[in-house]
């Protein structure tokens, strides 16, 4: 249980509870590269200089691509047994919600608050134990993964600072976890220790979508992990279509890849694919 002073701070923060009116979705090259093994996650005890990846960042009007050294790794040996899994599109959606809460001025937050931010819900709408558990696992994973990133060249190209060296090695989500009473219940509360790292980097490029809560609500369909991933993909792709009308098709296979479905032709998962297509149609309508 947190110390009395910390508990008072939590209760004070939640007494002023208000909800963000929109969700921030990070849409830069780094955030787009992380999910489903786009950037492999290494382990601290086996790291070498060869593991650093040179991520190529493009910018309209730039004379040449920007090279950004990046390394993603698990900081704790124990996660090999627990959460040593790739960063998924669902984890990305959770991180976007954390960035949203941080930007809205929250110092403390809960898994329920993250889920509500992901789905445009109010604090009156309940969160199921399953949904809370999925968010909690994702938060724990983000707190276990560290990102080394040198975005000095990006900073310079986007003219955010001259001759400024920006090298960061920190958790994707730097937060303390504590138990406290809020609203009469004992809950797990997280406290931001710094700005979520992907959001911090994103503010250099400014490639961010702001999605009104009305577009996040899925009353006609249960907001499962897969539905949240599909919804996030569709919102990003629709924004891309707005910018380039020639690329106005939504491919099922691209969504299947986002969901981690490797072989859509596998007859054993026909039922799963049918349900996912139904979800896509309902979300688009």
Features from the language model and the residues they span:
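Charged, alpha-helix-forming regions
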Residues: 1-285
């Amino acid at each position: 249980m947190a110390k009395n002073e910390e508990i008072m701070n939590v209760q004070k923060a939640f007494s002023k509870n208000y909800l963000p009116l929109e969700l921030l979705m990070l849409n830069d090259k780094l955030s787009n590269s992380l999910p489903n093994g786009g950037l492999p996650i290494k382990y601290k005890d086996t790291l070498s200089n060869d593991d650093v990846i040179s991520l190529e960042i493009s910018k309209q009007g730039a004379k040449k691509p920007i090279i950004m050294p990046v390394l993603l790794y698990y900081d704790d040996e124990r996660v090999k047994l627990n959460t040593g899994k790739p960063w998924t599109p669902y984890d990305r959606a959770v991180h976007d919600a954390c960035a949203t809460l941080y930007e809205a001025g929250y110092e403390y937050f809960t898994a329920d608050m993250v889920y509500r931010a992901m789905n445009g819900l109010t604090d009156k709408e309940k969160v199921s134990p399953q949904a809370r558990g999925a968010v909690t696992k994702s938060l724990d994973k983000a707190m276990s993964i560290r990102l080394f990133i040198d975005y000095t060249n990006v900073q310079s190209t986007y003219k955010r600072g001259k001759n400024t060296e920006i090298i960061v090695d920190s958790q994707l989500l730097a937060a303390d976890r504590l138990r406290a009473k809020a609203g009469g219940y004992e809950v797990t509360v997280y406290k931001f220790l710094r700005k979520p790292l992907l959001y911090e980097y994103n503010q250099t490029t400014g490639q961010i979508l702001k999605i009104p809560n009305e577009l996040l609500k899925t009353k006609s369909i249960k907001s499962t992990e897969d539905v949240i991933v599909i919804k996030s993909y569709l919102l990003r792709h629709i924004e891309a279509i707005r910018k380039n009308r020639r690329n106005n098709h939504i491919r099922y296979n691209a969504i299947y890849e986002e969901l981690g479905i490797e072989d859509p032709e596998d007859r054993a998962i026909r039922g799963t694919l049918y349900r996912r297509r139904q979800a896509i149609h309902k979300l688009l309508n």
